[in-house]
């Protein structure tokens, strides 16, 4: 908990100089709670499941986000987007099966709860699209750090080292402030169903990095990545077709 508190605190401080106007309202407060809960359940889930299992369970998020966006935002989702998300998720399953799956019931429950709150804070990012993304993320990360500090044990111990500081800065800046800002910024411009399917690109990029580092990548993992990208392509295909029809309509009037 203390490590997560530091991660959120540093991520929020990094964004503060770029925030136009700090705002705190009910929705931003709820966003902070949802983000904190998602991170907490994800971290605790990893104590019981392998990263491959966590990937399968966490990436049910788009499947949860679609009904939530309909319920909370009244957003409409096309059949093409749903098909793309289902195909993308099947790619995650194929990818993870090649890593080995040994499910733990408590791990399943914790990671699925993480996916639910991930979907929920994603929907709330979209709901808050009228606010400055930098300000929203700075406030929600700083609030989240207070929650984590409150939940941290009074007595704790960890060993300072250069590697620890490098890891902390990495997860705080790139994996914290910047990643939340980019996710929020995408949700300002496109519907939840359009953005969430892009999350399937994360395992693909991670695998590409592993390949560059010399980590063994088997054919099954590559097949899973191909299916993920197929899902992303299909989910965004309808938008391209609609643009093409508009352009053609202009020229043929």
From Swiss-Prot:
Is Glycoprotein found in the keyword set?
no
Membrane topology field: Multi-pass membrane protein
Q: Which GO terms describe its cellular component?
A: plasma membrane
Q: What induces it?
A: Aerobically and anaerobically induced.
Keywords from UniProt, A to Z, are:
Cell membrane, Membrane, Repeat, Transmembrane, Transmembrane helix, Transport
Domain EamA intervals: 1-97, 116-237
Quote the subcellular location field of this record: Cell membrane
Listed transmembrane segments = 2-22, 28-48, 53-73, 80-100, 101-121, 138-158, 162-182, 214-234
- Its domain of life reads Archaea
Q: What is its main location?
A: membrane
User: Pfam families recorded for this chain?
Assistant: EamA (PF00892)
The UniProt entry's sequence similarity note says: Belongs to the EamA transporter family.
Protein name (database record): Uncharacterized transporter in sor 3'region
Q: Organism classification, top ranks? A: Archaea, Thermoproteota, Thermoprotei, Sulfolobales, Sulfolobaceae
